[in-house]
A protein has these predicted regions:
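Non-catalytic scaffold segments within catalytic domains of secreted glycoside hydrolases
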Residues: 14-90, 94-96, 104, 108-510
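Intrinsic-disorder-associated, low-complexity terminal segments enriched in Asp/Asn/His/Tyr and depleted
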Residues: 2-7, 11-12
Length: 510
């Protein structure tokens, strides 16, 4: 062995020994999706001519709602203007390492006029609507009724993403309904039996299926994955149970909530069937799932009741066909993937109503029920919206949904209302770390979509709640990257949490 060879061997030994104590980062699969999600009502409006009528549009413009503080008084037509500025936002997304976009289509834009007179064949029995049949004649009639300019603009948006090499997830429903389907002001004044009642009316299942069939026929060539709807559980709970949240129709009625829940479930199944007639791409649903925890050990049965009613009811039906006390083959197997929207946890206890009877009760001071910009009862920081930052809950949700259903999962929303960008970098890294943990434990997790790329119109809260990696000046429509956008770029472009971001994996010292 000569002197040079000896030097090389000693150098390698020293180098390898040094690496043994060096943290090399949390690596994600090269094919992992990193991207953003949009919702038409929250992003599209803001430039002249981009407005459109829907139940949400009249809801946030209603003077009674504004005066009562039910909605903010901010108006969506002053929004970020994605309808015209989509290429600007796609440029930014590309520059910060994104490769996937979940785009929402607005039913009310496509069909501002009713489609109820386009008669289709329906299979229905006492259990529900089992099938909605569309043929070429129906599609031609729908094509005559549709707003062609809106269809063409969506094609331009999707084509621009396609040309950039993005994977496209098309979501067909993210809350707003055509006014002829749902008039929330009329429902509030007259009741669900005397006004267009949205998801409380089973005819909405039929109209929704027509719309989804039409979109899959017109735009399916540009789509990689489908989602029928976003957070149906939020629709039936906020609209008919948690009526102080500011969501339409604000009509307190448990019976209506249960009817809407059933109709949304059937609407997904019928939409799944019709999309599959035109597309071989996977069809899923996007669901809001907090990490549901007991306050005390004896609250575990209350947690199980809460989970079954709000989460597993939907998935048990679509995966296993289990519906209440029966089995329905027309629901079974209508799910190819699961989108999970995760923001925080929910801590549950029992609230006794009489004798041994109780209902699950969400405990204030944890999860989504905290004071803004403060601390939870667990001494964790909270967002501008009052949501506790609880990253480890994401791991729990991913593992449990994978264990129960064994379907591919995408994190379709995860983010924080943080105007000052105080917590967002830590929020981002700590949650992606929990995604890494789930992947390492065998969960078929395919991607992470951040909510949001840009600031957006946050429903009844208006413009005050800013979720964007990118700040939007709503007056000028200019975009400005926040520091957290560069953190996202490091992770997304390298497909790992690099060692220089290791300090953001764990909660900060409070």
């Amino acid at each position: 062995m000569n002197q040079y060879t000896l030097y090389i061997e000693i150098h390698n030994i020293v180098f390898d020994t040094a690496l043994e104590g060096c943290w090399m980062g949390y690596k994600l699969p090269r094919e992992f999706y990193f991207g953003f999600s949009t919702a038409g009502f929250q992003h599209e409006m803001g430039m002249p001519g981009s407005e459109y009528m829907s139940d949400w549009y009249i809801w946030v413009h209603d003077l009674e709602n504004i005066m009562a503080g039910i909605v903010s008084g901010d108006l969506p037509e002053n929004g970020p203007g994605y309808w015209e500025l989509y290429q600007v936002d796609h440029d930014i997304a590309q520059r910060i390492g994104m490769n996937t976009a979940r785009i929402g289509i607005e039913w009310a834009r496509i069909f501002p006029e009713p489609t109820v007179d386009i008669n289709v064949d329906i299979d229905e029995d006492d259990e529900g609507i089992k099938r909605v049949i569309l043929d070429e004649k129906h599609l031609a009639e729908l094509d005559e009724r549709a707003d062609k300019k809106a269809v063409e603009r969506y094609r331009q948006i999707l084509s621009d993403l396609r040309e950039r090499g993005f994977t496209i997830i098309l979501n067909l429903y993210h809350w707003p309904l055509p006014l002829w389907v749902h008039d929330p002001i009329a429902v509030r004044k007259q009741g669900v039996d005397k006004a267009p009642a949205g998801w409380v009316d089973k005819r909405t299942i039929i109209e929704f299926t027509k719309y989804t069939g039409y979109i899959s026929w017109k735009l399916g060539d540009l789509v990689d994955m489908w989602s029928t709807m976003n957070e149906p559980n939020v629709v039936w709970t906020t609209g008919y149970l948690l009526v102080k949240t500011g969501f339409p129709p604000g009509y307190l009625d448990q019976k209506s909530a249960l009817i809407a829940r059933k109709n949304l479930l059937e609407a997904h199944a019928r939409a799944y069937d019709v999309v599959k007639e035109f597309s071989k791409k996977p069809v899923g649903v996007i669901y809001s799932i907090p990490d549901i925890q007991p306050l005390k050990d004896d609250d575990k049965d209350a947690v199980m009741l809460y989970e079954q009613s709000n989460v597993y009811y939907f998935f048990d039906a679509l995966v296993k066909g289990v519906f209440d006390d029966t089995t329905r083959d027309d629901l079974k197997g209508r799910l190819d993937w699961v989108g999970i929207n995760y923001y925080s946890r929910a801590v549950i206890t029992k609230r006794y109503v009489s004798g041994d009877r109780y209902i699950p009760f969400v405990v204030p001071g944890y999860g989504h029920n905290c004071s803004p910009n403060g601390r939870s009862l667990d001494n964790r920081p909270t967002s501008d919206l009052g949501w506790e930052i609880y990253p480890e809950g994401l791991y729990n949700v991913l593992v449990e949904i994978w264990r129960r259903y064994g379907l591919p999962i995408i994190i379709t929303e995860n983010g924080i209302a943080d105007e000052r960008d105080q917590w967002r970098s830590w929020f981002l890294v700590s949650h992606i770390y929990q995604a890494y943990r789930a992947l390492s434990d065998g969960v078929a997790l395919k991607g992470y979509l951040h909510w949001n790329l840009i600031d957006n119109y946050e429903w009844s809260s208006g413009f005050k709640m800013r979720f964007g990696l990118v700040y939007v000046d709503y007056q000028t429509k200019k975009r400005y990257l926040r520091p957290s956008a560069f953190v996202f770029r490091e992770i997304a472009s390298r497909k790992e949490i690099p060692n220089e971001l290791e300090h953001l994996v764990n909660p900060p010292t409070l």
